[in-house]
Amino acid sequence: MKEAIIVDQLGIYKEPTLVADDETGVSSIITYKDSEGGKQTAIVQGHIVAVPVPEGLHLPKWDFTQEQWIEGKPADELLILQKASKLAELKRLCTEAIEGTFTSSALGEEHVYSFDMEAQLNFQSTKELMNMHPNFTQTSWKTRDAGVLMHTKEQFTRLWLDGQMHKTNLIEKFRRLEKELEHATSVDAVNSIRW
């Protein structure tokens, strides 16, 4: 047994059903109604389409003329859905990029630092502590590539600024792509926007 799709007379997707593995194409769902004179009249209630629905269709519709699945959702509604989906994708990718890692040469050579939410809070609280206490002139900080390294107050301030620039640059990238998304007038234009 395999899955097929029941569609109405217009080809609109109604529900899935099971058919024999060897069944292909389109078959009609017929009911019979008694009519005058004892004759039965065949009434087509819908169709079973034993053709797989391609991925990416939001409202699959069977086109009886072309004998293939097409998008049944109006283009303007489809564009709205695609924009919402793309915006959610861009937000997720931006957050992942921000909370990933960044590089800094605050120590004179480049090192990789974590910037997840915990690291961001630790950066902020350490910076505030250094600003409030003049005797707090250095701190050890974990890098992703060289373990824990000592940072002077000046080096840590530079590191903090590099982290903030990492975040700011990614937010600016998100805003630029968000603006591009707002101005997109077709699904193809939306799909062409990449993080």
Regions found by a protein language model. Name each.
Residues 1-195:
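A preference for well-ordered globular domain cores
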